[in-house]
Design a protein with these regions (language model features):
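Extracytoplasmic/periplasmic substrate-recognition and gating elements
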Residues: 299-363
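Glycine-centered hinge/linker elements that transmit conformational signals in sensory
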Residues: 199-201, 237-273
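Extracytoplasmic/periplasmic solute-binding protein
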Residues: 159-163, 168, 195-244
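Extracytoplasmic "Venus flytrap"/periplasmic binding protein-like
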Residues: 80-144, 180, 278, 285-286
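Hinge/lid segment of periplasmic solute-binding proteins
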Residues: 115-169, 306-311
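Short, well-ordered beta-strand elements
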Residues: 51-65, 84-89, 112
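Long, aromatic- and glycine/proline-rich binding clefts that accommodate carbohydrate-like moieties
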Residues: 357-413, 437-438
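Short, polar/charged alpha-helical segment
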Residues: 47, 63-85
Length: 439
């Protein structure tokens, strides 16, 4: 009996050893390191793309300063993602705009494009783009302002990732305006009423000041819409809707008439450093300029020159101004979708948005960056929920780009004399027809 018990015990011990030996030899589980902290957000230190080595071509319709910043950010991306090579190409915005308006624009076979927001819906309708919804994950879904995202939606999808914005402002020459009124008068104190705008050209001539009443980009229809919004004290896309025109008390017609009748007093050349010096010396009473251009100009002028000028952002208190944004879109023909999405996400990170702002003056698109902690002087965080930049665009469908091109051609024609004032008034009213918001 004892021998039988010993045999049973020996068999049981042998079975136990056989059962436990695989577990004893199994490797210990690997503990993943914690994500890095600090800064605005943590970016990956190694490539998460998960594809074969990818070669991306990027065409950027941006200015030289913006392109240089993009190049530096792209180099940092390539260090984090050694399996992804990226070739950057730049297209001058003015030349690209002319080619776009002539239906000759081409992205040169690129996988990714940086383009004006107004182009996005037209490119999506043409079947040129991949939806960008997958780039918006986590807090990125709610971060961009509605004024921007509304321009990038069509047919239920978001077709681009917003990178920056640069709305128009007006810069006043306060010395010129002060010379137009006696002490104690305020008619020509900015911002001007429609009546003061109408009287401004004649008042300048009456006082003998050799100054234009307005300096503005004669090639950009968004500059024109910015001034009309300033004149009428209305949202900048109101002239593009029948409802907006019906409720403006005839302000659109008054604005168009003033531009035609006083076009000889409009300065429409490029806003070069030489222009800003002459503007400070009394070349014009007011200039409509991009926010980044205005802030950069005042920084580069001497103290005495800059003292005569005042940037007026009060238009941003209205429901809507054109954001003037550039967004990243993904080509439907790319062979590296995942790598393209990762690049788009990282190029629009909060850290890169702040770098864009500090180096180029173009504003971030993320709500949470508008706090004192980040040093952004433009106080968009104080905007109401229904004001800019939180109000969707009324004109955001695929027809926007072509209609703006028509308005821009007519606007340029008025200023260079190829379009007579009477024809301008008739055609402009027709072109400012109703847009339908396609969200």
């Amino acid at each position: 009996m004892a021998r039988r018990k010993s045999t049973v015990i020996l068999v049981l011990l042998t079975l136990a050893v056989l059962l436990l030996s695989p577990w004893a030899s199994a490797p210990a589980p690997t503990v993943k390191p914690a994500s890095p902290s600090g800064g605005t957000e943590a970016l990956p230190s190694a490539s998460p793309v998960g594809e074969e080595p990818a070669e991306l071509a990027v065409t950027a319709v941006v200015g030289m300063s913006e392109f240089e910043t993009l190049q530096a950010q792209n180099e940092a991306f390539r260090l984090r993602h050694p399996d992804v090579s990226v070739e950057l190409r730049r297209q001058d915005p003015a030349e690209a705009g002319r080619r776009w308006n002539g239906e000759e624009w081409s992205p040169d076979g690129a996988d990714i494009w940086l383009v004006p927001n107004e182009w996005v819906a037209a490119l999506a309708v043409a079947g040129e783009l991949l939806p960008a919804d997958e780039v918006f994950v986590g807090e990125a879904i709610s971060e961009p302002f509605d004024s921007l995202v509304s321009q990038l939606k069509w047919n239920g999808y978001v077709w681009a990732v917003p990178r920056d914005m640069d709305p128009y402002v007006v810069v006043w020459n306060t010395e010129v305006l002060s010379a137009l009124q006696a002490e104690g008068e305020t008619k020509f104190s900015p911002p001007l009423s429609p009546e003061a705008w109408r009287e401004l050209p004649g008042k300048l001539a009456e006082t003998g000041l050799n100054a234009g009443w307005l300096a503005i980009d004669g090639s950009d229809p968004l500059a024109l819409l910015a001034w009309i919004g300033l004149f009428a004290n209305r949202r900048e896309d109101a002239p593009l809707t029948s409802a907006g025109q019906a409720s403006d008390g005839g302000a659109l017609e008054q604005a168009l008439s003033l531009l035609a009748e006083a076009r000889s007093g409009i300065r429409s050349g490029p806003l070069t450093p030489a222009f800003w010096r002459s503007f400070a010396a009394g070349e014009a009473a007011a200039v409509v300029a991009r926010n980044s251009a205005a802030t950069r100009a005042l920084r580069t002028l001497s103290g005495s020159e800059a003292a005569a000028l005042a940037i007026d952002r009060s238009a941003w208190n209205r429901d809507f101004v054109w954001p003037g944004g550039v967004s990243i879109v993904l080509s439907a023909k790319t062979k590296h979708e995942e790598a393209a999405r990762v690049w788009a996400a990282e190029m629009t990170s909060k850290d890169n948005q702040l770098q864009n702002y500090r180096q180029t003056g173009r504003l971030p698109v993320s709500r949470s960056l508008y706090s004192e902690a980040y040093g952004i002087v433009e106080a968009l965080s104080d905007s109401g929920l229904r004001g800019f930049p939180n109000e969707p665009a009324l004109a955001s469908g695929p027809e926007v780009a072509s209609r703006l091109a028509e308005i821009g051609a007519l606007w340029s024609g008025l200023l260079d004399g190829s379009v007579a004032p009477e024809r301008w008034k008739a055609l402009a009213t027709e072109l400012f027809a109703d847009f339908k918001r396609d969200r």
